[in-house]
């Protein structure tokens, strides 16, 4: 008789989380929100032909995602230890540079766009840092199971469970590496448990996948432990991460729900309006097909070639000459006029929905930049973006949470001290070491500096620099140094020209720019 397999305690807690998510209808609502954003807005409706879609949800989401994500964030570590002096300043400067390097290495700008967009669509999104290199993975809200679904602060959770689908061979390899017995490894088999997977759950046929859980919890001493489990096998036993006191995760919630750790996105509230706009469009097209074009009407037995009625340029032959007018045998029904009310209602529905969502034409940037200055465009944009100030503030908090998690990970994975490469002005790389006790002694805090970065902001900055140069208020060299690195003007090319000039004798110098005694810019 085969031995009955029992679920692990981790899987049982996961099942309780699934029950909660199902009660909240989280899986279906999230899937529905993503379908409408992606344009699959007639899901479940069967028709002989393609049905029309007027997708105003996607530009609304993309605009709001851009307005939040274009806030250029910079992590700044500071010390709360007044006695730290120059040494504390050096350590904080090294950590700031180290954070900048990791931000670029992990492509956090791109990652943040994805997190913000997912949160805008589904209400909340999560990022998980899973190794000493701070490699990150974006986690769907439906794959996160919290011990307390009313507690918004992840760091106050008793435990957190992350769900994922993994190839069976990879799981077995990890189980063998962790010293599991052969009979336990053989219990790891493919399954079809995709009921909680949102999006395309079609898997490539092969050795199969199985559902896996990452279980994170904090012991009484405040230290984080991890374990991994399938439904019946814990293939990575409980493992403490020495020195790690924070869950290596951060969450971004779009619109917080009252008394809930979850959030509400932009999509679900406007889906009824999107459906009605699509229905109106479909009805108008059907009406146009039925009534907007003239239809031939004829006496069939008096037409010699009825098959040619629909052919362009073909003559229609009649079988009799006893009629007074050919219109008695063959004529057209005039097109019926279409009421404009349906079109007006549809346009008004779409425009009102976009305006109420804060994503009208002005907000979406549908302004001719040739007819307005950069400052004017920015003023209009900033006024339209006022409703997003809460999301921008929460995005700053999200980046701050990431920065605090990074500090904890650095301390945990570098118990002997953190060595940071720092490039000096002369190009020589200096290795600075931060002792492990320094993290506690300095009592580090995080400040996030945010500044918007978008085409119109760049245009306004460069426009101001060009005016100052033209007015002689700055030199050309100062203009080049003041240009941002991502300016549309070729900063590096200008810098190379200046270096070439510096190497030439004074007599061979070309004419100076407007800020250097007149002439052209170069």
Q: Across the structure, where does each feature detected by a protein language model lie?
A:
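Broad gene-expression machinery/nucleic-acid interaction feature
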Residues: 124-126, 141, 211-212, 236, ...
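Extended, helix-rich architectural segments
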Residues: 1-225, 229-231, 308, 337, ...
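Catalytic nucleotidyl-transfer cores of nucleotide-processing enzymes
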Residues: 223-313, 479
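Generic signal for short, ordered secondary-structure residues
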Residues: 77-82, 95-99, 106, 256, ...
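Generic detection of long, well-ordered alpha-helical segments
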Residues: 85-92, 105-109, 266-274, 278, ...
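Helix N-terminus capping/helix-initiation residues
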Residues: 55, 140, 166-168, 265, ...
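Intrinsically disordered, low-complexity segments enriched in proline/serine/threonine
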Residues: 54, 61, 84, 169, ...
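C-terminal anchoring/interaction modules
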Residues: 1-30, 34-36, 45, 127, ...
């Amino acid at each position: 008789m085969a031995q009955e397999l029992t679920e692990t305690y981790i899987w049982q807690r996961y099942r309780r989380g699934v029950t909660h998510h199902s009660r909240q209808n989280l899986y279906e609502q999230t899937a529905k929100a993503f379908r409408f954003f992606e344009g699959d807005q007639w899901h479940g409706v069967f028709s002989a032909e393609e049905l029309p879609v007027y997708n105003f949800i996607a530009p609304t989401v993309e605009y709001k995602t851009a307005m939040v994500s274009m806030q250029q964030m910079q992590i700044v570590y500071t010390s709360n230890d007044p006695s730290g002096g120059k040494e504390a300043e050096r350590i904080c400067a090294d950590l700031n540079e180290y954070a900048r390097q990791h931000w670029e290495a992990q492509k956090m700008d791109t990652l943040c766009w994805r997190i913000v967009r997912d949160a805008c669509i589904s209400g909340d999104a999560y990022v998980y840092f899973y190794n000493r290199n701070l490699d990150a993975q974006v986690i769907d809200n439906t794959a996160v199971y919290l011990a307390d679904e009313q507690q918004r602060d992840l760091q106050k959770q008793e435990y957190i469970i992350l769900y994922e689908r993994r190839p069976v061979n990879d799981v077995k390899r990890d189980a063998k590496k962790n010293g599991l017995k052969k009979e336990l490894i053989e219990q790891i088999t493919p399954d079809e448990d995709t009921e909680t997977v949102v999006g395309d759950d079609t898997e490539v046929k092969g050795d199969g996948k199985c559902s896996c859980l990452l279980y994170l919890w904090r012991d009484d001493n405040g230290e984080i432990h991890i374990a991994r489990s399938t439904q019946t096998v814990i293939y990575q036993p409980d493992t403490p991460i020495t020195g790690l006191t924070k869950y290596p995760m951060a969450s971004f919630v779009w619109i917080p729900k009252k008394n809930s750790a979850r959030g509400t996105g932009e999509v679900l509230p406007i889906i009824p309006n999107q459906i009605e706009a699509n229905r109106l469009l479909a009805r108008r097209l059907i009406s146009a097909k039925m009534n907007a074009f003239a239809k031939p009407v004829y006496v069939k037995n008096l037409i010699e070639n009825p098959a040619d009625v629909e052919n362009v340029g073909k003559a229609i032959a009649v079988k009799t000459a006893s009629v007074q007018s050919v219109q008695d045998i063959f004529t057209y029904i005039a097109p019926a006029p279409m009421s404009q009310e349906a079109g007006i209602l549809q346009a008004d529905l779409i425009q009102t929905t976009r305006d109420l969502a804060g994503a009208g034409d002005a907000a979406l940037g549908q302004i001719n930049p040739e007819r307005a200055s950069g400052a004017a465009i920015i003023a209009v944009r900033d006024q339209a973006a006022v409703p997003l100030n809460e999301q921008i503030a929460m995005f700053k908090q999200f980046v701050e949470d990431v920065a605090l998690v990074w500090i904890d990970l650095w301390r945990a994975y570098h118990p002997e001290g953190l060595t940071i490469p720092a490039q000096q002005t002369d190009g020589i790389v200096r290795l600075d070491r931060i002792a492990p006790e320094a993290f506690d002694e300095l009592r580090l805090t995080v400040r996030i500096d945010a500044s918007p970065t978008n085409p119109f902001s760049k245009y306004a900055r460069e426009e101001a620099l060009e005016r100052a140069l033209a007015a002689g208020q700055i030199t050309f060299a100062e203009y080049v140094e003041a240009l941002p690195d991502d300016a549309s003007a070729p900063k590096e090319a200008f810098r190379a020209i200046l270096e070439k000039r510096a190497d030439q004798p004074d007599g061979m110098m070309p004419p100076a720019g407007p800020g250097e005694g007149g002439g052209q810019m170069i």
